[in-house]
A protein has these predicted regions:
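Active-site nucleophile-adjacent alpha helix/oxyanion-hole segment immediately C-terminal to the catalytic cysteine
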Residues: 1-62, 66-71, 75-76
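Sequence-level detector for tyrosine residue identity
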Residues: 12, 27, 49, 78-81, ...
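Conserved active-site-adjacent core of cysteine acyl-enzyme catalytic domains
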Residues: 56-112, 118-127
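Glycine-rich, aromatic-bearing surface loops/beta-hairpins
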Residues: 128-134
């Protein structure tokens, strides 16, 4: 079972669904797309891993490639939106985006990482609320 620990000062919850994580040491950074989809869709790690592997077979790429992730999210009925930022404005942060979207699942991308958001709460194995969404 995955570990969930709520931070009552924000809309962040610790979330680490990877069955190999033992509660100490380094986090597995390579599986962030899997964790993000697990959090947003309330699916277990192995199910999402298998979904991404199947998508990878269809696009002839690794399961965590951009094309594999895009196909997986499309199969899960997600719509891709780009963040539009006007000149002089800042990009939204993960925490602000989550607060402004209190209903529904979202998978968002920041520099080198992906995060799952569900009903206004963002789930990850580290506090990434300050990161800007791309």
């Amino acid at each position: 079972m995955h570990r969930v620990e709520q931070d009552v000062t924000s809309n962040y919850e610790f979330f680490q669904p990877n069955p190999s994580w033992k509660g100490k040491g380094k986090y597995l950074h390579e599986d962030c797309p899997i964790r993000a989809i697990c959090a947003a869709e309330h699916l277990d790690w192995n199910t999402v891993y298998d979904l991404l592997c199947d998508c990878g077979k269809h696009v002839f790429d690794a399961q965590t490639s951009d094309d594999s992730i895009a196909l997986c999210l499309k199969r899960l009925s997600y719509t891709k939106y780009s963040v539009k930022v006007t000149k002089g404005s800042k990009r939204p942060t993960v925490a602000n985006f989550a607060k402004e979207h209190p209903r529904g699942p979202y998978v968002v991308r920041v520099a080198g990482h992906m995060i799952g958001i569900k009903d206004g709460t963002y789930f990850d194995c580290w506090h990434c609320g300050h990161k800007c969404i791309y």
